[in-house]
Amino acid sequence: MTRLADISDIKSIIPLLMEYRTFYGIKEQNIEEVEQFLHNRITNNESIIFITFDDKTPVGFIQLYPSFSTVSLKRQWHLNDLYVRPEYRRKGYATALMSAAKKYFYDRAKGFTLITEKTNTTAKAFYNANGWKTDEYDFYTFFY
């Protein structure tokens, strides 16, 4: 089952988010900070999260953040996080999360953006198989 997450799902999302952050090299994590981060995103309507389950076990999530297009005068969403526990990969959970997000936003947004590493061939193949296209623009970043 895959569904839109709400405040009651925070405890289920916390371990998934911590595993996801560990994958990206975050070694020291504070569970209270993670919980507060999720709480703020959900209660302040700053992100949309879908969670997927194997029976009653949470196995993955997708989190999207809003932005806007001045040209189209519509909201668009940035797919920032997609995580499925390793033992549940290649079983349709990531596709279910992606499908839920696409369906939810179909009439609510211009579209989606995402960024993945050029060397992440697994993710790139997944996104291509799910209808994503690389664009003709150069994407610049400036981080502190």
What are these regions (language model features)?
Residues M1-P15:
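A short beta-loop-alpha structural element at the N-terminal edge
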Residues L17-H39:
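Conserved GNAT-fold acetyl-CoA-binding loop/helix
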Residues H39-I51, H78:
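A short helix-loop-beta-strand connector motif used in the catalytic cores of GNAT acetyltransferases and
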Residues I51, T57-P66:
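Conserved beta-strand in the GNAT
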Residues Y88, G92-A100:
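Conserved acetyl-CoA pyrophosphate-binding loop and the N-cap/start of the following alpha-helix
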Residues R89, F112-A123, T141-Y144:
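Conserved beta-strand-loop-alpha-helix junction that forms the acyl-donor binding cleft
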Residues T95, K118-E136:
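Conserved active-site alpha-helix within GNAT-family acetyltransferase domains
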Residues M98, F105-T116:
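Conserved GNAT acetyl-CoA-binding A-motif
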